[in-house]
Every structure is written in structure tokens, then in C-alpha cells.
UniProtKB/Swiss-Prot annotation:
PROSITE patterns according to UniProt: ABC_TRANSPORTER_1, ABC_TRANSPORTER_2, UGPC
Protein name: sn-glycerol-3-phosphate import ATP-binding protein UgpC 1
Name of encoding gene: ugpC1
Subcellular compartments: Cell inner membrane
Membrane topology: Peripheral membrane protein
UniProt keyword list: ATP-binding, Cell inner membrane, Cell membrane, Membrane, Nucleotide-binding, Sugar transport, Translocase, Transport
Family listed: Belongs to the ABC transporter superfamily. sn-glycerol-3-phosphate importer (TC 3.A.1.1.3) family.
SMART domains, per the entry: AAA
Length: 369
């Protein structure tokens, strides 16, 4: 186990900056997930930690030791890749133990440690097989075993589950979490899949455009997104976001004429300003179209998810999602009313995309990331 300190880390390709001064502290034994869309810089950051990419600026320290100038093998990290990177001509046992063989570890010690790793990952029946005779999930476990046997200070996972089908991904997520509980090693996991991120992370690091947007627990990031980007990226369905202006009466006006009456204490300081109103699908509920204060819309389509349903509504071309927690009869084309839980709304500055703090929640002791 080892803490990791990242200070002002930058990466340029030529004159093009791709990572912009990232600062991050990772505690010893913590499981961090770096989440973001393709091209956000998450894999580049991981590769800089591993030593596979040179750092343009800043400093990375692992277990208190600055590693900027160290070779990958000197950093105490083991990496698991998306494509497994197994030797096809070697057996499972040979693949797992290869790093020890190169390091000159005795055959008896190699066999002992291969046996321990194989038992931990349920690979004992497959030790004599070659990768071509394994399923995708088994190959990924071999790749994890090859990292485990090195007994690293830090595990680095670069989208390791992307090639697996949905059922295998669920199984491997559980496998990785159990592995982390057993070994306690500091782990950094990169993904664009928010389900993976939310289920695996002790803390999430959400990246966009080479910058860190937010760091927090999955619960904090989901319930208190600090930017318009995080609000729209994290969560399925994405947070409902409506851009408009707070008029002189403290009413939120969007789409030129549609109005939402906000609580006075939220609206008063923002009169005349353009803001983005955000709310999760579960912060709204269906009511009669003529109910007092209801937003009127048309049910576009209903997403059946088994234990729950999502109604995707149409506000004259503006999308809006409502999570149904009870048996409400609604079908495509029905006129609907939507009631909003104003305690769960978020307001973002339209120009910067950053959260506008809620003074009422702050006074009540709410924590904002």
C-alpha cells in the first residue's frame, strides 16, 4: 500500500496540451476511479503515473518518493490493460509467473506464488491452458494474476472490462472489489462506464477536457455535482438540465415563455442572471397536467427497467426524464404534469457551468464538494 501525490501534472503532445495541471491526493489503500468521456485525459494521466508517458510538468510521488525520472519497473506499480496483453505461446501458469522468472526468482518460489494467485482468482483448473483456450473473463483474471504476483504497491487498471459482455463485466467488477479488499493495495481504475465507476470507487475523479471536474465519493458526485458537465455526465438517465433566466419576479423562465417558480431564497440573489436548472429524474414525479404548479409535457417514450420505469417527456422539443417509483399508468403520447421537489434542484451559472451554492442548504450544514 502506498499513498500517491499528484501536483500540477501537465501533458503536452507537441504544442497541444492534453492534461492541464492536475492536483490529486490518493490515500494508501484507496480505490480511486477516474471517470470521463473518451479523450478527457484519464488514460494519459494513468500512464504518466505508471511511467509509460513522460510528464511535461508537475510532480508525481508514490509512497513519498518522487517518481518523475524513474523507469516504470522502479515505481512499484502493476498495470492491467484492456487488451489483456498475454503471451499466446505460454500457459496460464507461465504468463502469471513470467515477471518473477525475469527477476530471477527461484522455480520453487515461483510455483508457490503462482499457486497462491491462481487459488485467489479461481484459476487453478486452467494453469496448463494457453490464452486461446480461455474465455474473456478467464483471460482478464490471468492478466490480474500477472499483476498480483508482483505484489505491487499500486494497481493501475486501464479500462480492463471494456472487452467483456455485460454479464462478465458484472462478475469481474465483484472480483476486482473482492481482490482489493483482500490485498488492500492502492488502486486506480480508469473507465468511461459510470456503472463501473459508481460500484467500484471509494472516490471518483471526474475528468473533462484534461481537467479534473470533481473529486468525491460516488454519493457526493451523484447528489452534489459541482458543474454542469458532471451533472449531465454522471447518472442514468442524465440530470435534466434547462437553461434560462431568473426574471425580476424571481421566476425561472426558459424556452422564452415556460416558467418555473423557484423558492424565493434561491431566486432572489439571481434576478436577471442566466442559469441552468438541474434536477435528477427521481427529483420529479408525475401529476395531473392541470395540477397547481405542474410543468406540462407529453410522454415521449417509457423506458422499462424491470424494477423501475423512466418516463422520457417532451417539452416542445426539450427532453425531460421522470423516474417512476409506483405503478402509474402512462403511455407514449399522453399529456402529463410534472411536479418538482425543489429541495433537490441544482442551479449552475450559464457562463461558467459551475454550481451556484444554495445558502439555505449551506446554513443547514450540507456538504458541497
Amino acid at each position: 500500500m502506498a499513498p500517491i501525490s499528484i501536483r500540477g501534472v501537465k501533458k503536452n503532445y507537441g504544442k497541444t496540451p492534453v492534461v492541464h495541471g492536475v492536483d490529486l491526493d490518493i490515500q494508501s489503500g484507496e480505490f480511486i476511479v477516474i471517470l470521463g468521456p473518451s479523450g478527457c485525459g484519464k488514460s494519459t494521466l494513468l500512464r504518466m503515473i505508471a511511467g509509460l508517458e513522460e510528464i511535461t510538468g508537475g510532480e508525481i510521488a508514490i509512497d513519498g518518493r518522487v517518481v518523475n525520472q524513474l523507469e516504470p519497473r522502479e515505481r512499484g506499480c502493476a498495470m492491467v490493460f484492456q487488451n489483456y496483453a498475454l503471451y499466446p505461446h505460454m500457459s496460464v501458469a507461465e504468463n502469471i509467473g513470467y515477471a518473477l522468472k525475469v527477476a530471477g526468482v527461484s522455480k520453487a518460489e515461483r510455483q508457490r506464488r503462482i499457486g497462491e494467485v491462481a487459488k485467489a482468482l479461481s484459476l487453478e483448473p486452467f494453469l496448463e491452458r494457453r490464452p486461446a483456450a480461455l474465455s474473456g473473463g478467464q483471460r482478464q483474471r490471468v492478466a490480474m494474476g500477472r499483476a498480483m504476483i508482483r505484489e505491487p504497491k499500486v494497481f493501475l487498471f486501464d479500462e480492463p472490462l471494456s472487452n467483456l459482455d455485460a454479464k462478465l463485466r458484472i462478475a469481474m467488477r465483484a472480483e476486482i472489489r473482492r481482490l482489493h479488499r483482500r490485498l488492500g493495495a492502492t488502486s486506480i481504475f480508469v473507465t468511461h462506464d459510470q456503472t463501473e465507476a459508481m460500484t467500484l470507487a471509494d472516490r471518483l475523479v471526474v475528468m473533462n477536457g484534461g481537467r479534473v471536474e470533481q473529486v468525491g465519493t460516488p454519493e457526493e458526485v451523484y447528489h452534489h455535482p459541482v458543474s454542469r458537465f458532471v451533472a449531465g455526465f454522471v447518472g442514468t438517465p442524465a440530470m435534466n438540465l434547462l437553461e434560462g433566466t431568473i426574471n425580476d419576479e424571481g421566476v425561472f423562465v426558459y424556452d422564452q415563455s415556460r416558467k418555473v417558480a423557484l423558492p424565493r431564497e434561491r431566486a432572489a440573489p439571481l434576478k436577471g442572471k442566466r442559469v441552468v436548472l438541474g434536477m435528477r429524474a427521481e427529483a420529479a414525479r408525475l401529476v395531473a397536467p392541470d395540477a397547481p404548479g405542474a410543468l406540462t409535457a407529453t410522454a415521449d417514450f417509457i423506458e422499462e427497467l424491470g424494477a423501475s420505469r423512466i418516463v422520457h417527456a417532451d417539452f416542445d422539443g426539450l427532453p425531460f426524464a421522470v423516474a417512476l417509483t409506483e405503478a402509474v399508468k402512462v403511455k407514449s403520447g399522453d399529456p402529463i404534469g410534472i411536479a418538482i421537489d425543489y429541495d433537490q434542484i441544482h442551479l449552475y451559472a450559464a457562463d461558467t457551468g459551475r454550481i451556484i451554492e444554495n445558502p439555505v442548504m449551506n446554513n443547514a450544514g450540507a456538504v458541497h464538494a
